Amino acid sequence: MAETKFIFVTGGVASSLGKGIISASIGKLLQARGYKITIQKFDPYINVSPGTLNPQEHGECYITIDGHEADLDLGHYERFTDIKTTRWNTFTTGRIYSEVIEKERRGEYLGKTVQVIPHITDEIKRKMKRGSTKEKFDYVITEIGGTVGDIEGLPFLEAIRQLKWELGNRAVCVHLTYVPYLSAAGELKTKPTQHSVKQLQSLGIQPDCLVLRAEHKLSQGLCKKVASFCNVRPDCVVQSLDVPSIYEVPIKMQEQGLDTAILSLTGEPIGETPALAPWRSFVERRKNAKKVVNIGLVGKYDLQDAYKSIHESLSQCGTYCDCKVKLHFINSEKITDETAADVLRGMDGYVICPGVGPRGFEGKIAAAKYCRENNLVTLGIGLGMQVMAVECARTLLGYTDASSYEMDDKTTHRIVDIMEDLKSVGNPFGTMRRGNYDTVIEKGTKAYEAYGEEKITERHYHRYELNVVEYRDELEKAGLKCSGVHPESGLVDIVEFTACDWYVGAIYEPQYSSTVLHPSPLVMEFVKQVSNRKG
């Protein structure tokens, strides 16, 4: 392909319709046809990154391979396409404004009055077009967060308007809207979609494709009506109905010809329709799984999206283990040594989830103690691994006040501490270990059994580390094996309790690197152990 083509995905009527899934599905379908693609997300909020947003309100903060904090939709992009994301796949209003203000302070605008148009919109356009200038992608798919009509999103839509005018048929807009069903009337209503498109048109953008999100199937007549009233070709109107699994969406979009419509609009040959054989095999295997395993997620956020990547990784691995993973949220604030048996009852395995702050910390320790003492299949992630170490120090070493410096800076036994060379750094965000780091795994351990190799690379997102200088030897003598370490610093990345069948903790976040076709080896081994234990 001579020149990069651009696909802009916008949303209307309501939020949370699944723009991220549609963007990822488009990427998957074009990738299957041999095109080199990338997907990026522009979020209208003024936070520079999602790292400071409350997971209870916004969902998880996803981490790219270079350690950038990103929206959870980037997880969908990676899980669908197997393409690793970086800081260049995620932007916010706050980040763009910050960069423009920095340029103004450096005098790069030569005394001009800095305004939303052209300076902010030009910066947005530069970010949107980076994929065509740096890495030469065939298609750059850009998702715009929020809905049409939000005041925060206007600069992004203006940038799209300008790019569509400048690029001609090299730029298309895919607009996702909601078609509500009125049960009293027994009708699907297209008027909200018409108004959403009209609002987009009033901003100078004519959508080229419409994806109609609905709970009931639309008739051909309704689809033609929408096409006619919205100035869109009939073959460019597709439906996105509720499906049992998000991984069926690319197949449904392909069946309705969304990828061929985009190719036609951008002047590319249609060619033969890809079979998507591995993907279809995964979906069928998922449908045919009969066995059900129940896994408890021990955490403090009851919003499902707060642990989105963990949910998806466990679900993917369940498919490859021919079982359906049923997840149960267990509020760690309700767990004590006295209540653990009742609160944790009935699960086949447990994940002690990552998190920050003291709320729910003691409950996680009680959960870890119960799981270890009862030889239950358990995976600790991030803070979950730190909890495992603190619990062993309290119960097995007798250090009753043992804790993490994050939770108790007065403790005399800092089992988990901030790295020594980072204690003088004033900005807490400057002390975080984020992104890809190597880990060397000791042979003969459960971690090695999971990965099958000595050196691995996983994504980290944490500030505190196991205090290896003071406590590693004692913990290992008590049975907590440090089976994976960073090769240069000696920092402990993986622990496992040798007396248990499978009780493993990782300081890194294995769920971030788990995709549909390449699931996380550690999460896979955990689900396999859970399934085998159930029989």
Question: What do the predicted segments below correspond to?
Answer:
Residues 182-189, 386-395, 497:
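Glycine-rich, charge-decorated loop segments at or immediately adjacent to ligand/cofactor-binding or catalytic sites
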Residues 281-285, 296, 422-460, 467, ...:
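Glycine-rich phosphate/pyrophosphate-binding loop
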Residues 235-242, 328, 485-488:
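Beta-strand->loop->alpha-helix junctions that form or flank phosphate-binding loops
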Residues 1-323, 333-349, 356-357, 364-370, ...:
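Flexible phosphate-sensing "switch/lid" loops adjacent to ATP/NTP-binding sites
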Residues 17-20, 24-28, 32, 343-439, ...:
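Cysteine-nucleophile active-site neighborhood
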Residues 57-65, 243-247, 352, 373-379, ...:
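Short beta-alpha connecting loops at secondary-structure transitions
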Residues 442-535:
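C-terminal and late-domain segments of enzyme folds
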